[in-house]
């Protein structure tokens, strides 16, 4: 059993704590699922881009799915090889495209005809041939939260089949473009395998048509999105996931790329926070803690529910419903409504569970609150992987502006 009391003697709350053994095992589970088939697991940095986490994955020969030049540079700094990096996203700037091409990453996932022509122009100016993939929007309902659904025609992501064909033919004729992959990604936190298989089958059929037209495809990028169990939901079995994709690709000798993020890191992380006060207002019980929505946004943004565990011994205390809330001046600064917790006292510690994905990566300094300390548990030892910001860090980049006042 992990000794939290020793941890609290050294580190003040709130902080993130990650179990690196869980991250390692989650990644290896993907490698095992695709064992025996040409594949590349590109971890999606958007889920959590801490350098120490990336370094751990780099040592396991992970690739990287990046959506900004900042993420690409993070991946490289952590030791992920350029030939294992793919660059996705609907709004790549010309600067980002140029930098990615200079770094010679594996390929860019292209999301519009205008972007394709921009890449071509930049590649021509550099005197190189840009490896590209085209993201196809298969118009399939991923059955997930609308904010993280990306595979329907009303979503901003990818292009339809007809436009994709036109883009591939354009790229084939270009002296500065090299089409090497097809790509789709239908959403995040997916708990139903059927939409993924349906999308794989649909895009595999397109890939066969492209190959028949003389386009030399080498990769089949299925995106990511496998969900985790936040509320005891049944999740997708990775063996079934891999077999479904492999079956869709029968007759195609392509390297499979998948881009998991949440399912690699979510279950590894806890947000450790302490009780500041308890209050009752009009028969409503509130537990006020020292972490806020700026530290962990998912409950406020997505109405996501994360289990809360009391760390401080509380045997014998009366249990009753309460809302666990933070100090930020928003009514949405709520971690969990109607949580059944024992009576809590100032200084008691609680853990918000499964926050390793889209926790620290979505954090902000809202209300001028410094970003949190991040710790790793590895080989039964604790180490700091991100220092807590100091108050002075909040305005450090603004001080120059005061000189002219």
From Swiss-Prot:
Sites where the protein binds pyridoxal 5'-phosphate: 225, 259-262, 358
GO BP, sorted A to Z: lysine biosynthetic process via diaminopimelate
CDD domains found in the cross-reference section: PLPDE_III_DapDC
Reactions it catalyzes: meso-2,6-diaminopimelate + H(+) = L-lysine + CO2
Alphabetical keyword list: Amino-acid biosynthesis, Decarboxylase, Lyase, Lysine biosynthesis, Pyridoxal phosphate
Its EC number(s): 4.1.1.20
Binding site for substrate: 262, 298, 302, 330, 358
Pathway connected to this protein: Amino-acid biosynthesis; L-lysine biosynthesis via DAP pathway; L-lysine from DL-2,6-diaminopimelate: step 1/1
Active site per database record: 329
Entry-annotated residues carrying N6-(pyridoxal phosphate)lysine: 46
GO molecular function terms listed in the Swiss-Prot or TrEMBL record: diaminopimelate decarboxylase activity; pyridoxal phosphate binding
Cofactor: pyridoxal 5'-phosphate
Matches recorded under PROSITE patterns: ODR_DC_2_1 (PS00878)
UniProt cross-references to PANTHER family, sorted A to Z: DIAMINOPIMELATE DECARBOXYLASE, GROUP IV DECARBOXYLASE
Family from the record: Belongs to the Orn/Lys/Arg decarboxylase class-II family. LysA subfamily.
NCBIfam families xref list: lysA
Miscellaneous comment text of the record: May adopt an induced-fit catalytic mechanism, in which the active site loop (residues 137-155) cycles through down and up conformations to stabilize catalytic intermediates and release reaction products, respectively.
SUBUNIT field: Homodimer.
Function text: Specifically catalyzes the decarboxylation of meso-diaminopimelate (meso-DAP) to L-lysine.
Protein name: Diaminopimelate decarboxylase
Lineage per the UniProt record: Bacteria, Pseudomonadati, Campylobacterota, Epsilonproteobacteria, Campylobacterales
Annotated gene: lysA
């Amino acid at each position: 059993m992990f000794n939290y009391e020793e941890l609290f003697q050294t580190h003040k709350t709130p902080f993130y704590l990650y179990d690196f053994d869980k991250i390692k095992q989650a990644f290896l589970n993907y490698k095992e699922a695709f064992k025996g088939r040409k594949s590349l697991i590109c971890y999606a940095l958007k889920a959590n881009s801490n350098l120490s986490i990336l370094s751990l994955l780099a040592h396991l020969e992970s690739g990287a799915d990046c959506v900004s030049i900042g993420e690409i540079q993070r991946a490289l700094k952590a030791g992920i090889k350029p030939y294992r990096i793919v660059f996705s996203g609907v709004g790549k700037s010309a600067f980002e495209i140029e930098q990615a091409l200079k770094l010679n990453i594996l390929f860019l996932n292209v999301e519009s005809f205008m972007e394709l022509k921009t890449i071509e122009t930049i590649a021509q100016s550099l005197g190189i041939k840009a490896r590209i993939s085209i993201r196809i929007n298969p118009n399939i309902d991923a059955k997930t939260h609308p904010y993280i659904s990306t595979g329907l025609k009303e979503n901003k992501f990818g292009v339809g089949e007809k436009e994709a064909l036109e883009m591939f033919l354009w790229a084939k004729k270009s002296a500065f473009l090299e089409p090497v992959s097809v790509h789709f990604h239908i959403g995040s936190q997916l708990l139903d395998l059927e939409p993924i298989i349906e999308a794989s089958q649909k895009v595999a059929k397109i890939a066969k048509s492209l190959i028949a037209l003389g386009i030399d495809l080498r990769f089949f990028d299925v995106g990511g999105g496998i969900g985790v169990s936040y509320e005891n939901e049944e999740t997708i079995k990775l063996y079934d996931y891999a077999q479904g994709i492999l079956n869709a690709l029968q007759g195609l000798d392509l390297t499979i790329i998948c881009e998991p993020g949440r399912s690699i890191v979510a279950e590894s992380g806890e947000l450790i926070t302490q009780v500041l006060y308890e209050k009752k207002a009009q028969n409503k019980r509130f537990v006020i803690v020292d972490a806020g929505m700026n530290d962990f946004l998912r409950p406020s943004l997505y109405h996501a529910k994360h289990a809360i565990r009391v760390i401080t011994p509380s045997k014998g205390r009366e249990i009753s419903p309460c809302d666990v809330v933070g100090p930020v001046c928003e009514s949405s600064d709520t971690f969990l409504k109607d949580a059944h917790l024992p009576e809590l006292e100032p200084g008691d510690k609680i853990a918000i569970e499964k926050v390793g994905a889209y926790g620290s990566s979505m954090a902000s300094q809202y209300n001028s609150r410094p970003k949190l300390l991040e710790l790793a548990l590895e080989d039964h030892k604790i180490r700091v992987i991100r220092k807590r910001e100091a108050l002075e860090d909040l305005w450090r980049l603004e001080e120059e502006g005061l000189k002219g006042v």
